[in-house]
């Protein structure tokens, strides 16, 4: 079985060149925010998150602000935000609507809000807000935290790039982006959006997906943390 994964991984390596890495002078940043509330408070949290999203999308420099609710357990949420630059994010952090949300949701939290500032690494053109708004309830999101020891970071980078490039070519894929965490550069967030669960299921069985897992599993520093979400 290991030999199969090795062959698949080697087959994908020439594909890395097609999608360029982030330009050094590109100031765009991603913020991935995990919010876990008490199970009984999931509806209250959702009610607080919706106005936060509406206000934040109007912030200067905001390019994307998505609120996602985990399919199971449903009391876990994630915010996927893209900002033009650090200054825009700083202004959002200081904004009244952001501070109000954090104050109001605090009594419902079962863990501190987990903000992860990320640097776009392998990204494609962003889908428009109009297209996102038109997606039906069948659309599925996947957010995966990939953690490897620092001394093998360079080994996982080409595997992540190949995975992203091949996955974007799949039927039903709407987004497949990879970012690394600014403070821990060996931690990555993979952000996916699929037309429906069937498209995602097909992706999970694809040769390039299995090849990536074959590269990652022997070197990972943690369990494979993959979560499915629906847009609110």
Name each region found by the language model.
Residues 28-36, 66-93, 138-147, 177-204:
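Short, well-ordered beta-strand segments in beta-rich or mixed alpha/beta enzyme
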Residues 1-2:
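N-terminal secretory signal peptides that target proteins for export/translocation
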Residues 132-175:
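Surface-exposed interaction/gating patches
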Residues 54-64, 82-117, 166-174, 193-227:
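An amphipathic, aromatic/His-enriched active-site/gating alpha helix that lines ligand/cofactor pockets
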Residues 5-17:
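Bacterial N-terminal signal peptides
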Residues 27-63, 83:
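N-terminal targeting signals for Sec/Tat export/insertion, comprising classic cleavable signal peptides
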Residues 21-28, 66-73, 101-140, 175-186, ...:
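Glycine-rich beta-strand-turn "strand-cap" elements at beta-sheet edges
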Residues 42-46, 90-93, 153-157, 203:
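Solvent-exposed, non-transmembrane alpha-helical starts
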